[in-house]
Amino acid sequence: MVEESQFESVRSREQRPHESVDIRSTFESVSVVIPTVREQNFTAESLPDWIEPELATEEGLNIARNRGIERTDGDWIVLVDDDVTFPTRLTAWLIDAMHPLHVAGLEDYWPMNGILGRFMIFHRSLWKHVGGFDESRPHGGDTDFIVRCRNTGGAVVRLPRRLI
């Protein structure tokens, strides 16, 4: 005999769940932060006109990340480098499926098992809980942030680098 839950899973696959994600309404609770020192910002140029990014120009990458996040008010933070085509639809789908203890981003290089700061999504409450990015670190702030997220119970969702 087939249980009801098995029927439900078949139905949900057939319904294409991501088609029902309203991208604009998902982004109502999102802040896009782009640390940058460049005059031309390819990422900002690739954003839909209804997304207003926070350009963080402070000296020091981790300082810029933290100050940019502090100036925003979205529950979800998308931290992204200044030289990519912003994946609007992918970002909305990920956020729609995420829990506040999730951190999603591009997989780090082997043998590391974290994610890169090139594209990273997390909830503001997790960022606050772990104390943000360590501003005393000139390098490796993304790795340190992920380690501290994991140590506090966060789950890391690693995406293939080729996505972005």
Regions found by a protein language model. Give the residues of each.
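Acidic donor-binding loop at a coil-to-helix junction in glycosyltransferase catalytic cores
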Residues: H139-F145
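Short aromatic/hydrophobic "clamp" motif used to bind/position activated sugar donors
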Residues: I77
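N-proximal low-complexity "stem/linker" segments adjacent to membrane-targeting elements
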Residues: M1-W50
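Conserved donor NDP-sugar-binding/catalytic core segment of glycosyltransferases
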Residues: T85, T91-N113
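Conserved nucleotide-sugar donor-binding
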Residues: D73-G74, L116-V130
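A recurrent flexible, glycine/aromatic-enriched loop bordering the glycosyltransferase active site
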Residues: G105-F122, P138
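Active-site donor/metal-binding and catalytic loop motifs
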Residues: L159-I164
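Glycine-rich, basic loop-to-helix element that forms the pyrophosphate-binding segment
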Residues: E58-T72
